[in-house]
Amino acid sequence: MPRFLRRSLLTIVWLSMLKGAVHRAGTPQGFPSEPQSRSLLVIVLDENGVAVSSASLILTQGQTVLRGETNYAGRYEFARLPAGTYQLRVEKEGFFALVHEEVRVGEAESIEVTLNHQREFVERVDVTYSPPAVDPARTTSSQTLDREEILNVPYNVTRDIRYALPLLPGVVQDAFSQIHIDGSSTHQIYDELDGFNITNPVSGLFTVRVNVDAVRSVVVQSSRYPVEYGKATGGIVSLKTGMGDDYFRFSATDFFPSVQSRKGLQFSNWTPRGTFSGPLRKGRAWFLLAPEVEYDLNIIQELPPGADRGTAWRFGNLAKTQVNLTPANILTGSFLVNDSNSQHAGLSRLTPVESTLNLSDAAYLLTLRDLAYFPNGVLLETGLAWSRFRDRSLPLGDQPYVITPDIVRGSYFETSHSHSDRLQVTADVVLPPVRLQGRHEFKVGTDIDRISYDQSFDRQPFSILREDGTLARRVKFPASSVALARNNAEFSGYAQDRWSPSDRLLVEAGVRLDWDQIVRGVLVSPRLASSLMLTRDGNTKLVAGVGTYYDASNLQIISQPQAGERFDFFYDKNGQKLLGPPVATSFRQGEGNPKAPQFLNWSVGLEHRFPTTTYLRLGFVQKRGFNGWTYLNPVTESTAPLSASYVFSNSRRDHYDAFQIQARHTFKGDHMVFASYVRSSATSNAVVNFSVDNPVFSPQAGGPLPWDAPNRFLSWGWVPFWWKCDLAYSLDWHTGFPFSVVNENQQLVGPPGSMRFPAYFALNLALERRFTFLGYQLALRAGFDDITNRHNPAFVDNNIDSPKFLTYTGIQGRTLTARLRLLGRK
């Protein structure tokens, strides 16, 4: 059966199921036999007066139970209620649950409820955590790490939020700290901080750092995300940070430096971070400051004194403020600073000081957001953000750079400077709900971005020697200095309808339009998703969706023809005679404007909550990408003369399929255990990455993507232990990532991804005890990362002609960890 017919048939079947569900579930829960005249409007706000959407409402009177969920404006109206006294329970994950025992319908037409965000250290002992729930209004395939999970679960580099994301199934991290969601490349992911784009505008990488202690939650959406999100086919990473309230609060983490026993007792690193928050004016204005500092000293045992040390420092701070101009008009501003510098970066036994780099990079984000609620029920949210990214890479000196199988010598061959800016303007409008064959909530919005980018390179010739010291290759650059610049303008708009024919069925349909000055064509992205509550108790849900997604134009890929050329001169075994003319490496843009990379995604899921506070989730997702951006090498045979004349092409095709099962159990006292298994396949017909700095003299070819992990088991949690301690753990096992084999001429040997790293396994354990000292609440943790000492490698010598072929490096091994946190004053 042709593919389009199969998909059409699936769509018809699904719509038929929805139609039947409307007829079966068309009668709302409530009091169907009695005439009703009363109504109750529930308004849910947080402690700062911001509307809380998707809050679960349970209204009970005797044996009658009514359920509802707040809309975008934090409102929900219970209609046709008999007068009387009710109990109202309000819950949402990430907030403390709240119960109003006496809500008198008939005496009041509305009730305003304040939900407080969960905090690690609270003044009251009678608070109740909102348990994981089956959310009838969530059609997106999304997963959340809340503040408790981010702080309690042990993982590598707990000061970097990117290392927490692999705690979610479907999310893997590569050796360069970059994140991949459901088989996607990092640049196919949209990263946002409090609703603003923080993705690097050139590379598409996630490089911005935020103080982990300031993060309230991280939401990862991998499929079925609505049309308000675009410019990403891989998924959405949404970081949400906190805000002060009417109490002054402070916290501090890792404020004591650590030491190391290398060449005597030496300073190792110091990574303090803290948060300070409180009112500027109680009930109306608040602030948050979240500074962090990192200083590292790297000592290499094998190097001589005076040439054995590298240092790195980093400073970051998030400053936020919120002012409620009126209860219906809220203004929020923020300023994020990242600044780091590394001296002698890359220092190792194989890379002496003279061959290292001095690295400097910075990122800045300035935002302003206005939220207005109008009396007619309209919600208007406007935003303005400016961001800047700067990267510099400076070698030490100007000595000729020489690469040997055992060590490098001289000064690194390349100097680079890069600057990029993004100006972002957003506007979103939520219209009042409309009753027409059910309830409709309409949302429209726009996103306008202006991106500028410039980069310069200064490259010097370098040589590559064989094991016996003879010259194998000499590399020269026709233009030692290269400068490039590229700008882009992006315009987006969307319209979305959330239709609830009944209290058990939700259909979310929308369309998105995108245009930019590189592709220069209007991109239309229709999407459809729905959720159906299979049981009246709200504990079982079926969800499915299909949609078209486009990637943002990647300036790094499209600008490669401007990045310069290089010539490789190959020598015979004696290192004296040239084997032929030099091989030129160049990139060329094809004719006409490129097409936008496009994906068609569809997925289906089943969720169920057992009475024992156990939550089960099953899911299947399929992604099919086409028109992907890549470069092709015209050489067609591995025996043909070396060639590196790369031509831009829209011929990349990516495939991803995955089945996932996960379970979560919550214990009394907010302890929990999570486990999941994912079976997946991530492949492409173009997996070879070509670049001027590291060319591959082979044709483009297909195979598994470098982050493909067909089998993965993941588990983590924290449980009560002896002596009032909590035992926390994380366990991650997955198939090793694939890698390609090359020869000394940088030609592929066999198909790409023909070999794999050993299976990855890491078990992290930690014990934490909370106690009071001098009136302050503290938490002391000690544990081990990779307690089994698995020695998971990050890199491999993939040169089949190298005497160290298949030698693994980048091995961490077992690491003792400790953490001291000041939670506040008791």
Regions found by a protein language model. Name each.
Residues 18, 22-146, 199:
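Periplasm-facing N-terminal accessory domains of Gram-negative outer-membrane beta-barrel systems
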Residues 96-114, 123-243, 253-265, 269-275, ...:
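Periplasmic N-terminal accessory/gating domains of Gram-negative outer-membrane beta-barrel systems
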Residues 129, 250-258, 289-295, 333-337, ...:
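Transmembrane beta-barrel strands of outer-membrane/channel proteins
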Residues 266-341, 358-381, 526, 676:
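Transmembrane beta-barrel wall of Gram-negative outer-membrane proteins
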Residues 529-647, 758:
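Solvent-exposed loop/turn elements at secondary-structure boundaries
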Residues 613, 724-745, 768-826:
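C-terminal beta-signal and adjacent terminal beta-strands/loops
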Residues 617-742:
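Gram-negative outer-membrane beta-barrel transporters
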